[in-house]
Amino acid sequence: QNAYYVHIDLEGGEGDVSFTGNGSNGMYVWGVQFELGTFPTSYIPTNGATATRGNELAVIDGEDFSDFYNSVESSVLAVGTVQRPVEDQGQLNIFHIGDDNTDGHGVFREHGTKDPWYHIRNNNSTPSGGNLNPSGFGDWDAGEEARIAIAFKDGDQAISVNGGNQVTATVTSSYPTANITKMWIGSHGTGSYFEGHIKRIAYYPKLLTDNQLNTLTA
């Protein structure tokens, strides 16, 4: 059996404040929560019983996706903070634009280098030049915010991280466009869940320039 307790401090501007109940006055405590996991998340309404949090991820598909997605050229901005320590293995996807086979365009913290990566995948393989790693950023550490922007069209791909760690590449063969049907936020659809907080996702139905990518992520 595991035993837990909650310690509550009442503090004012000058330090601790004492409080003694008198049978009528009191204090209200809201949102005290125990969680399994390596880091705390947001409040889970439990209504007096144990609750299990599902994976916090979103998918945009169907007409909701096709109404805004430009299959010829696109750009995406993502801002997020990971919580998993760099010494822990695992790929953490902040977003993925693709299909049910995970083909497409994904941005994640890579499990080996711990750097932010932009990965292009087609027919379950990586085309030549399909891994863009802005290694100048270094490890994406737990608690560190990364501002990542990518731009892509056939033959022209780029990624910028925090305003200057930029990599461009040319991927002219096996470019995944025709089968892209969804956008996942916080995973690549079948796993690689992003363990952290995503502050912003923005989509642009055009190819932004390198300077524009750097400005967005600065």
Model-derived segments and spans:
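Extracellular glycan-interaction surfaces
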Residues: 1-18, 27, 31, 109-174
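Extracellular glycan-interaction patches encoded by glycine-rich segments
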Residues: 10-24, 178-203
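Short, flexible beta-strand-to-coil junctions
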Residues: 11-13, 97-102, 153-154, 187-190
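Acidic glycine-/aspartate-rich tracts in secreted/extracellular proteins
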Residues: 13-14, 35-41, 82-86, 124, ...
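A general structural signal for short secondary-structure junctions and capping/turn motifs
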Residues: 21-25, 65-70, 175
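Residues that flank catalytic or metal-binding motifs in active/ligand-binding sites
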Residues: 23-30, 74, 103, 144, ...
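Extended recognition patches within non-cytosolic domains
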Residues: 35-68, 166, 199-218
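Extracellular glycan-recognition modules
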Residues: 58-118, 203-214
